C-alpha cells in the first residue's frame, strides 16, 4: 500500500485557488466573476489557511473544489466562450469592412438564459421570498439611475417596471407592516406568505455622476441581470395568487375614450400604472383576502387557549385593524412632498390619495375638493387653508402606521416641532438603553404618560408641600387657641372676674374640662403603648465592599480569558470590546437624557415660579385698587 503524500488529502484537496479555477474552466477573470455571481458561488475562508494552500503562507482567494466542479457542467460556460469567438469574428469583420457580415453576426448575438439558474437556486417559492430583500433594494436603486456607461437604459427601465409591479402587489394584498425614514432612504417591510421582506427605496435626488470610480457598476449590473429574472418570476406568481392579470392591466372604467388615451394608449396605461393610484384588473370579481382572514381566525378559535394561540389571535386582530387604518380618509399631497412613498402607504391601508395633476399623471381629485380630510404639507406656512381638513406633515402618516393607530394631528401641524421619529425595526428585547419614546412606540398606552410624568411628579410634590404647610398651620392655630383659652380661664372672663371668684357653674365647667383632658391623656398613653409594642428593632446594616466585588468580577473575567482557546482569543477580545462600547454608549445616552430632562424640569419650575409671582403681584394690585 502506497503511503499518501503530504497535501494529497484533507483540507488541501477541499479548496482550490482562483488562478487554478480559471485554468480549469478556461475562462477570463471577468467571465469567471460573472459566472460565480449568477450561480451563487463565493470565496471561502478555511480554518487552516496554510494547510489549504499546501504550505504557502501567501493569502489567496480560495473556493471549494466541489463548487468549481459544479461550474464545469454549467451551460453558461459555453455561452461565455461563444462571446470570445463572437468578439474575434466581429473584430475581423470590422477590420476588413465587411459590414454585411457584421450586421448578420450582431443579429445572432449569443444571449445568456438564466431561467434554469433561478429554478436551481430557489427550488421553492418561499426560498425566493427569503432572498428578496437584496433583490428589491438593488433594483429600486438602479431604477433611479439614468443611462450610464455600464448601465444601459433598458436595464434601468426594466428595474423600474418590475419594482412598480411589486408595489402594486403590496398595495393590492395590503401586506405592508412597517415603515421608516432614514438618511439612506425609505425602509419598507411587508409580510408575504409568512415571510418578512424588507427593502429600501432611495430618496428622490437628482443623479450626481461620480468623479472617481469607487463603485464597480459592472459587478452590480451583473447582480441586477440575475435579480430582474428572479423578480419577474416572483411577480408573476404573486399576481396570480391574488387573481390579478399579469402584466398589470386596468379595467375598462379607467380606459375611457379621452384624447390622451386615444393618442397613445401604451404610454397612457404605463403612466397610470406608475401612479399607483388605480385598482388593477382582476380575473375574478370576488376579493378573497377578508374571507381568508376570517377563516384563519375561525381556525385559531377552534384551537386551545394557550399563550401562543392567544398571542397569534391578538396579532391577527391587530393586522386586520391595520389593513383598514386609513379607510374613509382622503388625502391630498402638496407638490413639495415626495409622492410615491406616501401613495404606497395610504393606499396599502385603505385610504384615498391624490395630488396636483401638473406634477404626475393619475390624480383623481383636485385640491379644492371639500371631502378631503388631510392635506400633507412640508412647508412652514400655506396661503389658503380649508377649515374642513387637517394640514399635517408627512411624518404623521409614517408614525400612524408604526403605532398601528390614528395619532392626534396637533403635534404634526404646519410649523410644529415634530416628535422623534423612531425606528420600528429595532429589537424590543435588547439589553440596551431604550428611550421613553420607543417604549411608547412598543406600548401605545404609554404614549402620553411619559410626557406627563414630570409634570405629574412636580404637581404631586407641590400638593404634598401644600398639605404639609396646611397641617403645620392648623397645628399652630390650634395651639394658639388652647393658650388663649387657658389664659382666659386663668385671669378672668370678659367682666374681669378672677378664677377665685368664679361661680359654681364655672367650677363645674372647669371640672368637665379637666375630665376631658384626662381622657385625652389616657388616649395618648394608650397610643404610645401600642407604638412601643409594634416598634421594630434596629437591624444590622450589611456593608458591601465595592472593591472586593469589583476585584472578584475582574478575577472572573481573567479566568474566562485564560480558558478561551488561542485561536478564539481575537474573537473573544472583539466581543469584549463590543460589549464595553455598548455599555459606554448606553451610559452616555442615559447621562445625556438625564441632563436634558433636568434642564427641562428646571425651566418648567422657573416658568411656574414666574407665573405665581405675576399672579400674586396682580392680586396685590387688584386688592389695592379695591381699597
UniProtKB/Swiss-Prot annotation:
Concerning PROSITE patterns, the annotation shows: BRCT (PS50172)
GO MF annotations for this entry?
A: ribonucleoprotein complex binding; RNA binding
Q: Which residues form the BRCT domain?
A: 321-414
Q: Where is the composition biased (Acidic residues)?
A: 454-469, 497-521
Where are stretches of biased composition, namely Basic residues? Answer: 540-549
Q: Which GO terms describe its biological process?
A: maturation of 5.8S rRNA from tricistronic rRNA transcript (SSU-rRNA, 5.8S rRNA, LSU-rRNA); maturation of LSU-rRNA from tricistronic rRNA transcript (SSU-rRNA, 5.8S rRNA, LSU-rRNA)
- Which positions form S-S bridges? none
- Which keywords belong to this entry? Coiled coil, Nucleus, Phosphoprotein, Ribosome biogenesis, rRNA processing
Query: Where are the compositionally biased (Low complexity) regions?
Result: 616-627
Residues annotated as carrying Phosphoserine in the record are 453, 457
Q: Where in the cell is it found?
A: Nucleus, Nucleolus; Nucleus, Nucleoplasm
Q: Which HAMAP family match?
A: Pescadillo (MF_03028)
Q: Which family does it belong to?
A: Belongs to the pescadillo family.
Quote the PANTHER family the UniProt record gives: PESCADILLO - RELATED, PESCADILLO HOMOLOG
- What is the name listed in the Swiss-Prot or TrEMBL entry for this protein? Pescadillo homolog
Organismal lineage: Eukaryota, Metazoa, Ecdysozoa, Arthropoda, Hexapoda
Amino acid at each position: 500500500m502506497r503511503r499518501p503524500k503530504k497535501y494529497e488529502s484533507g483540507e488541501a484537496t477541499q479548496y482550490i485557488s482562483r488562478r487554478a479555477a480559471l485554468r480549469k474552466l478556461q475562462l477570463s477573470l471577468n467571465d469567471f466573476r460573472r459566472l460565480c455571481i449568477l450561480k451563487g458561488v463565493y470565496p471561502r475562508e478555511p480554518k487552516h489557511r496554510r494547510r489549504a494552500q499546501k504550505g504557502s503562507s501567501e493569502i489567496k482567494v480560495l473556493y471549494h473544489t466541489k463548487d468549481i466542479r459544479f461550474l464545469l457542467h454549467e451551460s453558461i460556460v459555453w455561452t461565455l466562450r461563444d462571446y470570445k469567438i463572437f468578439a474575434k469574428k466581429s473584430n475581423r469583420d470590422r477590420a476588413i469592412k465587411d459590414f454585411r457580415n457584421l450586421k448578420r453576426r450582431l443579429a445572432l448575438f449569443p444571449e445568456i438564459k438564466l431561467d434554469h439558474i433561478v429554478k436551481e437556486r430557489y427550488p421553492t417559492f418561499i426560498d425566493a421570498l427569503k432572498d428578496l430583500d437584496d433583490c428589491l433594494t438593488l433594483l429600486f436603486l438602479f431604477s433611479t439611475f439614468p443611462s450610464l456607461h455600464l448601465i444601459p437604459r433598458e436595464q434601468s427601465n426594466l428595474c423600474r417596471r418590475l419594482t412598480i409591479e411589486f408595489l402594486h402587489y403590496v398595495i393590492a394584498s395590503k401586506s405592508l407592516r412597517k415603515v421608516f425614514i432614514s438618511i439612506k432612504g425609505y425602509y419598507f417591510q411587508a409580510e408575504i406568505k409568512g415571510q418578512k421582506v424588507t427593502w429600501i427605496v432611495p430618496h428622490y435626488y437628482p443623479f450626481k455622476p461620480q468623479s472617481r470610480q469607487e463603485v464597480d457598476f459592472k459587478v452590480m449590473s451583473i447582480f441586477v441581470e440575475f435579480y430582474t429574472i428572479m423578480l419577474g418570476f416572483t411577480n408573476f406568481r404573486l399576481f396570480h395568487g391574488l387573481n390579478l392579470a399579469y402584466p398589470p392591466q386596468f379595467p375598462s372604467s379607467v380606459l375611457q375614450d379621452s384624447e390622451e388615451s386615444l393618442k397613445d394608449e401604451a404610454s397612457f396605461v404605463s403612466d397610470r400604472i406608475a401612479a399607483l393610484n388605480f385598482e388593477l384588473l382582476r380575473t375574478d370579481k370576488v376579493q378573497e383576502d377578508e374571507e381568508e382572514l376570517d377563516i384563519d381566525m375561525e381556525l385559531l378559535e377552534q384551537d386551545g387557549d394557550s399563550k401562543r394561540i392567544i398571542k397569534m389571535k391578538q396579532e391577527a386582530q391587530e393586522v386586520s385593524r391595520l389593513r383598514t387604518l386609513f379607510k374613509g380618509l382622503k388625502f391630498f399631497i402638496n407638490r413639495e412632498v415626495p409622492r410615491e412613498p406616501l401613495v404606497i402607504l395610504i393606499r396599502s391601508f385603505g385610504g384615498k390619495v391624490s395630488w396636483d395633476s401638473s406634477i404626475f399623471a393619475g390624480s383623481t381629485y383636485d385640491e379644492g375638493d371639500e371631502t378631503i380630510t388631510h392635506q400633507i404639507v412640508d412647508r412652514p406656512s400655506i396661503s389658503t387653508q380649508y377649515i374642513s381638513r387637517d394640514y399635517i406633515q408627512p411624518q404623521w402618516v409614517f408614525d400612524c402606521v408604526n403605532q398601528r393607530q390614528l395619532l392626534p394631528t396637533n403635534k404634526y401641524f404646519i410649523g410644529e416641532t415634530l416628535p422623534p421619529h423612531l425606528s420600528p425595526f429595532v429589537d424590543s428585547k435588547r439589553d440596551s438603553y431604550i428611550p421613553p419614546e420607543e417604549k411608547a412606540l412598543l406600548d401605545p398606552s404609554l404614549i402620553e404618560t411619559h410626557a406627563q410624568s414630570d409634570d405629574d411628579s412636580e404637581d404631586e410634590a407641590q400638593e404634598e408641600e401644600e398639605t404639609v404647610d396646611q397641617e403645620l398651620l392648623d397645628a399652630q392655630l390650634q395651639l394658639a387657641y388652647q393658650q388663649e383659652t387657658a389664659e382666659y380661664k386663668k385671669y378672668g372672663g370678659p367682666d374681669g372676674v378672677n378664677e377665685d371668684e368664679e361661680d359654681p357653674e364655672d367650677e363645674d365647667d372647669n371640672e368637665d374640662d379637666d375630665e376631658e383632658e384626662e381622657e385625652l391623656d389616657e388616649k395618648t398613653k394608650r397610643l404610645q403603648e401600642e407604638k412601643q409594642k409594634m416598634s421594630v428593632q434596629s437591624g444590622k446594616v450589611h456593608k458591601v465592599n465595592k472593591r472586593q466585588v469589583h476585584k472578584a468580577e475582574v478575577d472572573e473575567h481573567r479566568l474566562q480569558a485564560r480558558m478561551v482557546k488561542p485561536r478564539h482569543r481575537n474573537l473573544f477580545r472583539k466581543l469584549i470590546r463590543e460589549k464595553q462600547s455598548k455599555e459606554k454608549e448606553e451610559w452616555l445616552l442615559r447621562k445625556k437624557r438625564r441632563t436634558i430632562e433636568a434642564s427641562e424640569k428646571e425651566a418648567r419650575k422657573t416658568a411656574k415660579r414666574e407665573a405665581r409671582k405675576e399672579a400674586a403681584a396682580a392680586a396685590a394690585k387688584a386688592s389695592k385698587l379695591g381699597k
